Amino acid sequence: MTTTKDSTTEGTRSAGAIPDLRYSEAEEQLRAVVRDLLDDRSPWPAVLARVDAGEADDLPLWHTLAADLGCAGLLIPESHGGAGASYREAAVVAEETGRAAACVPYLTSAVMATAALLGTGDGELLGGLASGRLTAALAAGFGSLPPAPDDGGSGAGRGGERGAGGPWPVRAGRPDERDGSGVARLNGTVRGVAGALAADVLLVPGDGVPFRLYAVDAAAAGVRRVPVVSLDATRQLADVTLDNVPGRPLATGEDAARAVAAALTAGAGMLASEQFGVAERCLGMTVTYVKERHQFARPVGSFQALKHRLADVWVAVTQARAAARYAAACLAAGDPDTPVAVALAKAAAGDAAVLAAQECVQLHGGIGFTWEHPAHLLLKRAKSGSMALGTPDRHRAALAALVDLPPPPGN
């Protein structure tokens, strides 16, 4: 599958220009293809069966999505075998994976790991990702915070709390300079890494002087990936332990910090699109149900109290769409406003997804609380996604700091 950049998003936007947040024809075509695949290969019964069995990623589905549809290479330039598309197209796929609660490492490999590698220019790994031959994951906890808006996207302004400056739990030994490769031995444990179980390559930020980003073969001796209990069983987390494992350096110093910061920022922005997809699916399911469910000889959706609740959800979902689309447009254009747009989108979409999923469960009545109904999958996806890569309150606190407002309580 190939796609082309829309003329309104290619390159950096001129100062003051307003991006077109509408979906282009190419984006809608991409959506239709991805939705058809997920509806066919990952319907609710299949997802529920996978969760019941305690299985992690659906690798056959991921291979089809990554290699056959080319979604793994959307962000990768054509010179490395990718589609040369933008974050706008990547956001469309994220929306659909959220809508289906798909058990695929799209966010962690095709977005976060790819964004980090684009910052290093490693053609070999980028080519492997674009072809679908390799899957990668950034060895950072899924709760890691992207750079704050006042960092200017560098990742260097907040040290270990927010951004890419560290400290990181993996320590890098002195590189072996005998063959000029710079390979270093890595030791440490990273907790709660998303996408680690499916990854062939781990991108490991190594704390040291200088700070470096390393590529590690996930199958190498000394690498242990232990699944951990996660609220969202459709996106399994793992603790990754490295015991004297060789790591090939990809970037050093500020280049490495920028690569990791780019991965976290892109991940948060595309997770906002995924959360919007969850919210929109929950709203659609609920509206359909209250139209069909009758009580007192009339559809329950005709009751004013339910109308008001669903109207509130619709407003939240619509706002989340606008914020997520703006963040995707800023990422696509390399806009200086990207950190602000991503923080706004992550906060808005996280809240909207949780609200929509909660109302989906409650307004479905008794059936909404059963294991056989998919509402609980969407609720867990919504809640875990809202906590990943910065909670809504943490992102709002970062935005408040820009205008010297106090953060929300508890931040």
Identify what each model region corresponds to:
Residues M1-G98, T265-N411:
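Alpha-helical interface subdomain recognition
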Residues A102, S230-D232:
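Interfacial loop-to-helix transition and helix-capping segments at the boundaries
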Residues Q236-A266:
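A short, charged helix-loop
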